[in-house]
Amino acid sequence: VVGGDECNINEHPFLV
């Protein structure tokens, strides 16, 4: 899931 900083940053902090 690509959202940015309001997606799953805690699980996959790549699109922060």
Swiss-Prot record:
Signal sequence region: none
The protein's enzyme class: hydrolase
Enzyme Commission number(s) of this protein: 3.4.21.-
A molecular-function term among this protein's GO annotations: serine-type peptidase activity
GO biological-process terms attached to the record: proteolysis
Source organism, top-level taxon: Eukaryota
Cellular localization per UniProt: Secreted
UniProt keyword Hydrolase present: yes
Keyword annotations of the record: Disulfide bond, Hemostasis impairing toxin, Hydrolase, Protease, Secreted, Serine protease, Toxin
GO cellular component, one term: extracellular region
Tissues of expression: Expressed by the venom gland.
Record function comment: Snake venom serine protease homolog that may act in the hemostasis system of the prey.
Family named by the database record: Belongs to the peptidase S1 family. Snake venom subfamily.
Protein name: Vipera russelli proteinase RVV-V homolog 4
Record organism: Daboia russelii
